Amino acid sequence: MAIFDAFRKNRILGKIAVAFPKELKDDLEKVVSALLYSIKEIEGGERKWIMSDGETVAIPYRIDVSHFRYIAYTGLNERQMAILHCIYTRSLDGFVREGHLKELLRMGADKYEWVKPYIISSAGEYVVEILDTLYNNISEDKIPEYRAFCKLNFENIRLLHARMISYWAEFYRLDCYYYKDYIGKRLFSEVFGMRKSGQKVID
């Protein structure tokens, strides 16, 4: 059993290690141990994000991970809990993604730069409640940090912005006819500094 557990752990770590900075190796191993039989599959389509120190992380599009609402992840410190919540923001279940985004923002985990790509990636979701969660829970004093990170990763922001507009046009135009009033527009403009299509830089 121990051999099988070690094999499973190494297989998961081999796929997910690129999603976090190398300095978090020990913390990530502890989180993966806690989720050893919850993580079933890590789907491809990773998007690369640049950290301010030049290191790159690759966030997976989705992670098939079981969610236990009342489970107590005993023994995990704050940073490790932030890693766990980041993993769940890639869940297949939109309600789970939204809940763990709220937890990340509630605990102020976006003080860690490596948390920001998980939060920002969620702005490209089709679930409008997630956009609302981000807009209403990102602290105003953190906005300069988000904009600096978005500026560093402008191509990703441009693509997410285009996706957000596409989802509005496809799914939400009947409920919010004017794009200027759409929560996604306000999120990208007021928080991330991406005010319009064709914008060349975030200032």
Tell what function each PLM region has.
Residues 103-107, 137, 141, 171:
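Residue-level signature of the C-terminal ends
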Residues 110-114, 129, 141-145:
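Alpha-solenoid repeat scaffolds
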Residues 100-103, 130-135, 198:
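Conserved hydrophobic register position within alpha-solenoid helical repeats
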Residues 91-95, 121-129:
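Short coil/turn segments at helix-helix junctions and helix-capping linkers
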Residues 101-105, 119-120:
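Amphipathic alpha-helical segments within well-ordered protein domains
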Residues 84-86, 116-120:
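Buried hydrophobic core positions in alpha-solenoid tandem helical repeats
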